[in-house]
Amino acid sequence: MKVRRIVANIETPNATAANRFYHDVLGLDILMDQGWIVTYGSGETMQVQVSFMAQGGSGTPVPDLSIEVDDVDAALEAMEAAGFAIEYGPADEPWGVRRFYVRDPLGRLVNILSHR
């Protein structure tokens, strides 16, 4: 058996509410929209990981999602320009990432990061 894909499923009464955050700001493509489910993604090959955490590191809560970007400072500027409140950071962490926490429109805590 070979795992082909891992999908994060996030429950929400309004599946399109995440569009401005994930599509407009982060630039993910809408791969599927059935009204009750909207799937965001990219045609680029990405590494998939599943993390099991007791804490978020540096005294932070465990985020619902972690999204690695190529330029965390550009992502921070885009989030702030779109009016999303930054809840932590930006911070250069001792394990080699620069990151910040932001809440998406669904109230989920998202860790946006880049490796240094």
Model-derived segments and spans:
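Amphipathic alpha-helical segments
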Residues: N14-D29
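Vicinal oxygen chelate
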Residues: N14-A15, L65-L109
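Short secondary-structure junctions
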Residues: G27-D33, I86-G89
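N-terminal beta-strand motif that seeds the catalytic metal site of vicinal oxygen chelate
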Residues: M1-A17, M46-Q47, P63-L65, H115-R116
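Conserved short beta-strand elements that form part of the metal-binding/catalytic scaffold
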Residues: D29-V62, L109-S114
